[in-house]
Regions:
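Catalytic or ion-coupling anion/metal-binding cores of large enzyme and transporter domains
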Residues: 2-56, 60-62, 67-87, 93, ...
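Short coil/turn segments at secondary-structure boundaries
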Residues: 58-62, 94-102, 122, 127
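Amphipathic coiled-coil/heptad-repeat helices and related helical stalk/stem segments
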Residues: 106, 132, 467-470
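Well-ordered alpha-helical segments embedded in enzymatic catalytic cores
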Residues: 105-112, 134, 266, 431, ...
Length: 594
């Protein structure tokens, strides 16, 4: 019986196409000029891209520059040819005004590279917050065989004998400084001690959360998300990832076969169990939209709200990335969900095994870090989706609602899980910093801090500024948090139980633009509503008087972004881009360049 003819790889349309000999010669000779051979290029071996997100500008991902060597070794040993290329940098901690602008820009650039260059598959190097969604969005749009390689979290941080987490310690330290308990030098010493090595945040912030969800989706090898960056297993994972991408190419396994509706539902359940970042809903919705999968905030409410918190990691718990990894990481969390019947077990993964096969024997080694489903750290720990008479949707992360907040705001007899508060409204973070300590505002414990103009259009990009600290005077009295609300986001490392991502945002005429300081708001978690307590006539009067207040764009990309971007409720996508699905298969090969 004769073997089936070998499938012609995509790269061969560049490097070995006798029907277009002139173009083939042009493509081949330029890749030969740095030492590659015609034999290699025309061998029919898979050409594998390595999407390099590491650079001096992206410290959380910088070690990918070294890890890429292990990826290349794996690719070569599996018979492939590696080609490394840079991705537009995304550095959450240093990009101004916000790295959210870079998520969509890096996505666009990566789509063009994967579509327009002679690549048969790609290893997506991820780490810092928005590198993961940017890469997965591009993988979804192109549907080129792809696999995710996380760079992993940094080692656990310690300060004066205490475990401290990157990002999370910042919010604690700023309160200590406001209370006069530490000075600037003490603040800097404390916060920098949280980051002792290469890698992304060691807390369950956006970076670790999104890499965990990439694994839950099936787009990385089992255990990939949680291996700390300096561990030897991280290099071993890089090598295995390089080998596996070649197999995915030869078997023609594509993201559309992995990132199905059921896989996204699994990821939502995992996010709740992790106590994942509040940035996960818009990122996961964006990936799904580019994959052509219907996913909405209603799905987060329906699938994830009643899932318990299983992972005892900061900011919702007390441990960090090393403890999470040693306790079993993502597979151990999914094992608990599997036992509880909360997983689609037949979902395919890039490993070649189903989710059910991977997690069936993945027992945790530490039940103080990964709790059993039947005895969780907290019940009903997912995101709740809110609406009201001045907005359509917002989210609140229930895993970080602590006992102090619940006692103060959610425990009034006869009105449990609801409260009224006086609004203090700020026009962006500059206004907040300028006025938060103004005695004339008379801010007390029954106030809610409101910030607007920080959404996708207004900022632009949506800023992580909703988790606002109380005035220093209150902090000195022991009141270290107030309810917060806004049309922007907050850091995934924050333990603030804020009402976030309010859509539509103020800048596009959302009702948040109508709020005034001293208005009263009623927050009711039973009905999942936040209502402005003014009558309809007053609401209409304010709407007639409203005029847009959007600061000018500072760069060409900001201007273009504002014209094309949607709201956080639908993923903050560039809306025209969501119309282009699986472009490599559906649009045919790119036209020749000469």
């Amino acid at each position: 019986m004769s073997e089936a003819p070998k499938r012609r790889l995509r790269s061969e349309h560049w490097f070995n196409d006798p029907a277009h000999a002139d173009m083939t010669a042009l493509y081949v000779e330029r890749y030969m000029n740095y030492g590659m051979t015609r034999e290699e290029l025309q061998s029919g071996r898979p050409i594998i891209g390595i999407a390099q997100t590491g650079s001096d500008l992206t410290p959380c991902n910088r070690h990918h520059l070294e890890l890429a060597q292990r990826v290349k070794a794996g690719i070569r040993d599996a018979g492939g040819i590696p080609m490394e290329f840079p991705v537009h940098p995304i550095a959450e901690q240093s990009r101004r005004p916000t790295a959210a602008l870079d998520r969509n820009l890096a996505y666009l650039g990566l789509v063009e590279i994967l579509h327009g260059y002679p690549l048969d598959g790609v290893v997506l190097t991820t780490g810092c917050d928005k590198t993961t969604p940017a890469c997965l969005m591009a993988a979804a749009t192109t549907d080129l065989p792809a696999i995710v390689l996380s760079g992993g979290p940094m080692l656990d941080g310690h300060h004066k004998g205490e475990l401290i987490g990157s990002g999370t310690v910042l919010w604690h330290a700023r309160n200590l400084m406001a209370a006069g308990e530490i000075d600037y030098e003490g603040f800097m010493d404390m916060t920098t001690a949280a980051s002792p090595s290469v890698g992304h945040c060691n807390t369950m912030g956006t970076a670790l959360s999104m890499n965990a969800l990439a694994e839950a989706l099936g787009m990385s090898l089992p255990g990939c998300a949680s291996i700390p960056a300096p561990y030897r297993e991280r290099g071993q994972m890089a090598y295995a990832t390089g080998k596996r991408i070649c197999e995915l190419v030869l078997q023609d396994i594509r993201p559309s076969q992995i990132m199905t509706r059921e896989a996204f539902e699994n990821a939502i359940a995992v996010a709740s169990a992790l106590g994942a970042s509040s940035n996960c809903p818009p990122h996961l919705i964006a990936i799904a939209r580019h994959m052509g999968v219907e996913l909405s905030l209603d799905d987060w409410q329906r699938i994830g709200e009643d899932v318990p918190l299983l992972v005892n990691c900061m900011p919702a718990g007390k441990y960090l990335g090393e403890g999470f990894h040693r306790a079993g990481g993502v597979p151990a969390v999914m094992h608990e969900l599997q036992k509880a019947g909360r997983l689609h077990q037949d979902c395919a993964t890039v490993s070649g095994k189903t989710i059910g096969e991977i997690v069936s024997s993945a027992l945790t080694s530490n039940v103080d870090v990964i709790y059993p489903f039947e005895n969780p750290l907290k019940h009903r720990a997912g995101f709740i989706v809110l609406s009201g008479n001045f907005f359509d949707s917002a989210i609140m992360k229930m895993s970080v609602v602590g006992e102090a907040f619940r006692k103060t705001y959610l425990s009034e007899p006869g009105a449990e899980n609801s409260f009224e508060a006086r609004a203090i409204v700020f026009e962006g973070p500059e206004d907040y910093h300028a006025r938060i300590d103004d005695p004339a505002l008379d801010i007390d414990e029954r106030c809610i801090l409101v910030i607007r103009g920080v959404g996708t259009v207004g900022y632009p990009g949506s800023a992580e500024v909703v988790n606002m600290a109380p005035p220093a005077a209150l902090i000195k009295q022991g009141i270290d948090s107030l309810p917060c609300l806004g049309d922007g986001r907050q850091s995934g490392t924050s333990a603030s139980p804020s009402i976030l991502n309010m859509s539509p945002e103020a800048a596009v005429g959302g009702g948040l633009a109508l709020l005034k300081t001293n208005d009263r708001l009623k927050v009711d978690l039973n009905t999942r509503t936040v209502n402005l307590l003014i009558d309809e006539a007053e609401m209409n009067r304010r709407r007639r008087e409203w005029t847009p207040n959007i600061p000018p764009s500072q760069t060409p990309w900001q201007e273009l972004y504002r014209q094309l971007v949607g709201q956080l409720s639908t993923g903050g996508c560039l809306e025209p881009a969501t119309l282009h699905l699986r472009v490599i298969a559906r649009s045919g090969e790119p036209r020749h360049s000469h």
